[in-house]
Amino acid sequence: LAENLVPTYADIESLVVEDGKVLVKTTAEAHEIPTPPADRLGTVKADEICGYGGLLDSLSAAHHASHGVHEGALVRNGEVLAYAEDIGRHNVLDRLRGIVEDKKIDVSDVMLIFSGRVPQSVISKVHGMGVHLIASRALPSALGLKLANEYGITVVCGLRSDSFRLYTHPER
């Protein structure tokens, strides 16, 4: 799911982990699944984005204790639909993807509030989830911004409760 090779859990027939190898049997041939272009997020006000500036701090005790975990939350209209934390930023996105699939969350109008840097690998995962806006405390890479621009993903970084930087798709 996280690499966008299998559309849903239902397409996985079996999963075997043995001797350090993983074998996944699927109902369909593995291939990249195109993400539908559906984007119902519309225009987002700056105040709404800033309102999420302190969200991750309010959700994670682990971050306060260690300052060693990444976090991500999918939000819609002030409601947290999914939250994940992990020591790896990619793992956070994989966990969120699993929650989206498990709970059947429609992500066409959600924002991802994120703690990590935003390189092209993060944008690829965000695109695979079908999310159209990522707002992160950290900064993006040039390649991440290039890919986000191609995918139509709005990138907001340096997120704080009183400010942020908008990098792509200002029309949103």
Residue ranges and their predicted role:
Residues 1-77, 82-83:
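Intrinsically disordered, low-complexity regions enriched in acidic/Ser/Thr/Pro/Gln residues
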Residues 8-9, 89-169:
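Feature captures the catalytic cores and cofactor-binding loops of soluble hydro-lyases/lyases
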